[in-house]
Amino acid sequence: MRMKKWKKIFAAVLCACLFLAGCGRKEETENISRETQESQSDEGEIKIGLSFDSFVIERWIRDRDVFVDTAKKLGASVNVQNANGSVKEQISQIEYLIDRDVDVLVVIAVDCGALTEVMHKAKEAGIKTMSYDRLILNADTDLYVSYNNKGVGTLMAKALKNAIPDGGDIFMIQGAEEDNNVKLVREGFE
């Protein structure tokens, strides 16, 4: 029975993430939705903790709204936390979500290398964990949803090569070093 619950939890979270990423086909999403809703009466509401690094980037506000709306339609509740760019605050909020006994913890990390310990605490508490967009390093999360960041870097490099005359200089401004995606985009760019 417990394994069935985890499958339903992952189905709900995965469905919400696929909806955000625009990767799921309509019929797949509807099947997952129906399966998740059928399981709700048997096992109670799924509780999802969703920890954002900040809402400075407009995308995160949009992702939050779509994620929460999709989860509610699937019968899950979402506790949204915003760390406002503070690693210390995000760790505190993740500990809060662990104490609230969420079933799944979805994290957009402020610092990809600073959350390892608190994510291990979540796993020890039996909470399924997911890195959303930014891989939390050495945390052994159950799921990682993101873009092909190396591919993004390669596409950027090709576009610049086609747009700039031979021998032209390129000055590249990147994101924060705490974001593992920066490293991956750079690898693809080179």
Regions found by a protein language model. Give the residues of each.
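A residue-level marker of the well-folded mature domains of exported/periplasmic proteins
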Residues: 2-5, 23-190
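Sec-dependent signal peptide recognition
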Residues: 6-12
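C-terminal motif of bacterial Sec signal peptides marking the signal peptidase cleavage site
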Residues: 18-22
